[in-house]
A protein has these predicted regions:
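RNA-interacting cores
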Residues: 1-191
């Protein structure tokens, strides 16, 4: 399930650092029921030593935007669009209720009015599925060099490990939801 937000900054323009994911993540946590936000942030869905939040969000989209290299900021003209998705409908329900109640939010010290909040219902696929990512997918592995120092290797989509690691990550997340690998559907030839 997904929520699509249409935001209108009071000034008509939202200025935000180029690396703004933490700002959106904080906005999402602040917009949830406090107990749910605390549980999600501190606990989440567990798989071995990992904790998954099981929500995602797109980049901010705007028809007109500019980048100021000297300050490292993006200027996004109204309207601005954001999609937030989650497997867990409770997260999106809590988010939607609070956003409708408040009617506006502050992003990077700019007040933004919610012009619309739309719920996109979950589509249950039948057969093969082509997925289009609306934000970049980063796949990496931490390795150790001959000197013993940790190094992060980022895979490209053209490397075999890229899709294998994505699939393994999805499988871990599914197990964190269902609690047991035996409850998952058969995954033969899934990629």
């Amino acid at each position: 399930m997904r929520i699509s937000l249409k935001l209108e900054p009071q000034s008509g323009i939202l200025k935000i650092p180029i690396h703004y994911n933490h700002i959106l993540q904080a906005f999402i946590y602040r917009s949830l029921d406090r107990a749910l936000a605390d549980w999600l942030h501190e606990e989440g869905y567990r798989y071995e030593k990992r904790r998954f939040k099981l929500f995602t969000f797109s980049r901010l989209r705007s028809k007109r935007r500019s980048f100021d290299r000297s300050s490292g900021t993006l200027s996004l003209e109204s309207p601005i669009f954001l999609k937030i998705g989650s497997y867990e409908t409770q997260i999106l329900e809590s988010l939607a209720i609070h956003l409708v109640k408040w009617g506006e939010a502050r992003l990077n010290r700019t007040v933004c009015r919610f012009a619309s909040i739309e719920v996109e219902m979950r589509v249950i696929p039948k057969g093969p599925l082509l997925v289009r990512a609306i934000s970049p997918i980063t796949v990496y592995r931490t390795l150790y060099g001959t000197d013993g120092k940790r190094k992060t290797y980022y895979f490209t989509p053209w490397e075999k490990e890229f899709q294998e690691l994505i699939f393994d990550n999805l499988k871990r997340k599914a197990i964190s939801i269902y609690g047991d690998e035996n409850k998952l559907p058969p995954l033969d030839n899934a990629y």
